[in-house]
Amino acid sequence: VRCVSQMVNSQANNIKSGWKNIFSVFHLAASDQEEAIVELAFQTTGKIITELYVKQFPSMIDSFQDAVKCLSEFACNARFPDTSMEAIRLVRSCAHSVNGAPQLFADHAGMENDGAVAEEDRVWVRGWFPLLFSLSCVVNRCKLDVRTRALTVLFEIIKTYGDSFHPNWWRDLFKVLFRIFDNMKLPEKHTEKAEW
């Protein structure tokens, strides 16, 4: 984690295709129980999201889903509640990145399945859906305070940006939302869900 953090801090402008691997390392570190590991990985991930996305988002777009998944894992680490809340805040800032560059997602067909996805739906498939789905996963997996924050941010994103969603995107979104509430109907297996 320290080596990857050092590489990001010193050579971020030279990293082109390695962002997926960087987020994979930080995703693994996000679930660790050692505070120093989680903190270093999260600080570097936060720097990528807040500083580097502003400067070089187009060259990092292929790793966007990995970044969101990584933030979701930080949010679900129950041992570090402050990091969890900050990770959810960063997911919300990722929504701003998606909203600011919808054409970038449409134009950049770098993934193998993008040929089957209509150009106008690529921002949904590669941007909005992974972001909203990751928040729903946090709602389903985490402690009450983190779940509540994730649900609040999920609905804030929908209220803020939902007017730009196409009708077929809403169908996908409702499936995600209904899944959250369907999970709450299941018999209790985890004490955290009993808090609802």
What are these regions (language model features)?
Residues 20, 65, 129-130:
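Amphipathic alpha-helical repeat elements characteristic of tetratricopeptide repeat
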Residues 23-25, 42-47, 64-68, 109-112, ...:
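Short alpha-helical linear motifs
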Residues 1, 9-17, 25-40, 55-59, ...:
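Short coil/turn segments at helix-helix junctions and helix-capping linkers
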Residues 2-6, 24, 43-50, 69, ...:
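Residue-level signature of alpha-solenoid helical repeat scaffolds
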Residues 1, 75-119, 174:
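Eukaryotic alpha-helical scaffold "rod" segments
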Residues 45-49, 100, 104, 140, ...:
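Extended alpha-helical scaffold regions
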Residues 95-102, 149-165:
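A short, hydrophobic/aromatic-rich structural module that often spans a beta strand
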